[in-house]
Amino acid sequence: METWIPSEWYDDILDKIAVATQQSVCSQKPTNFYEAYWPNSIWTKNTQYALGDLITSPTANNFLYECVSAGTSGGTEPGFATNATATFTDGTVTWKTHNNYSIVSTPMEPDDFIKTEIEHGKQLQVKEKVGILIYKSGPIAYTALLDVANKKMLHVTKATSVLGTPLEKGNLTVFYTYNIKHVAEQ
């Protein structure tokens, strides 16, 4: 069977991916935004948190915490839940627990993406980023592109050329250039 897809559809798909505001390297395949996102906020005592705020624990475990009931955190560090989807109270805040596989991430800008035509389709090149601080040790498995403002995961790809390479917390790393291709079946 021969198929044909209008080239503007490729543009639409790639344009939706190119609004990404964060790129993350993950130790496992993320299936949602929370598993790939790493917030810049670490839990702090006696702090006002709004609905939807995202934090990590001071020990940087493999979880991310979402404020599901706004309030003020307690004066001492809570017992952070370590079961995905569990909730717990901290002062007057209620947190929901999410698995998190992100080990390093970097902000993305519109000029970090270059869309070009290729034979039978289009591609989106994601530019290289260097000197990115690793915040959690783990092996490289997947790269995710995220729309942070809308809490959406836009694209995930297996990091085949560096799959399994261990990253160590505190070191610097490189996010290599890669291409996202949409090609018509021939």
Where in the sequence are the language-model features?
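Small cysteine-rich, disulfide-bonded extracellular modules of the LU/uPAR three-finger superfamily
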Residues: 1-39, 100-142, 148-186
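Short beta-strand elements bearing conserved aromatic residues within extracellular beta-rich modules
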Residues: 65, 142-143
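Tryptophan-rich substrate-binding surfaces of secreted polymer-degrading and adhesive proteins
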Residues: 40-100
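Hydrophobic beta-strand positions
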Residues: 55, 145-146
